[in-house]
Each structure stands twice: as structure tokens, then as C-alpha cells.
Amino acid sequence: MQYAKPVTLNVEECDRLSFLPYLFGNDFLYAEAYVYALAQKMMPEYQGGFWHFIRLPDGGGYMMPDGDRFHLVNGENWFDRTVSADAAGIILTSLVINRQLWLYHDSGDVGLTQLYRMRDAQLWRHIEFHPECNAIYAALD
């Protein structure tokens, strides 16, 4: 199978305020902070900074740290590799979406469960054709 960088849309400055509520629903403040916390935990050289918001053509999206490549370590599954900023953003956002999906499923919040289930499926469809899909799969395994 050949991989090509899937089409994505960088969210413009004028749309940044509406992107996170679109992506995470009314849980957006917590979910955004959780992405930053995971970056701090999983990327040893991460010192904070600007994040790009990426919208997928078929819906959903992800957050991506500004930079070229990041060393990412997931102590829960022994993942320890350097990946592109794009792959790092996908990994971190996917982890947050998945954890929030199960949190709201277990608490009985049908609306947020459905939103996170949809966002999870949209991001996985994007990952399937990403040039770094094998690294992303390994990080999320």
C-alpha cells in the first residue's frame, strides 16, 4: 500500500476560537489542557509553544505542536521514537479523544460519547493513509 500525506486544512487565525468547541464539544477546555499535559509528559524536549489546529476534510481534526520532529515516549506501551510534529499531534489528540470517549461512555453522557466516537472514527480514517501510520499505530497500541 502506498501512503501519501492526506489532505488537511490548517485552521486560520479567525477560526481558531471556534475550532476546539467543534472538535471536543463543550468539553473543549479540559480536552485542550489534556493534550498539552500529555505533550509535557510524553515529549521530553517539549517546552510549550504554539499549536496548529488541523481540520480534516471529512470532519474532525487534531491539534499539532509547532515544530519539525519530536521525540515521543509512551511508557504505557514502550513506544519510544522520533516522529513528525504532524504525527505527534495526531497521537496526542487521539489519546485524548479515546480517553474522553471512555470517560463519557462510563458516566452515561450520551451526547459527548457520540461526539467522541465520531471524532475517533474520523481521526482513524485519516491515520490509515498517513505516511507515518505505522509509528502512529505503534504509539496508540
Swiss-Prot record:
Q: Which UniProt keywords apply?
A: Plasmid
Alphabetized InterPro entries for the sequence: Antirestrict (IPR004914), Antirestriction_sf (IPR042297)
A Pfam family the protein falls into: Antirestrict
Tell me which domain of life the UniProt entry assigns to the organism this sequence originates from: Bacteria
Homology family: Belongs to the antirestriction protein family.
Q: What is this protein called?
A: Putative antirestriction protein YubI
Source organism per entry reads: Escherichia coli (strain K12)
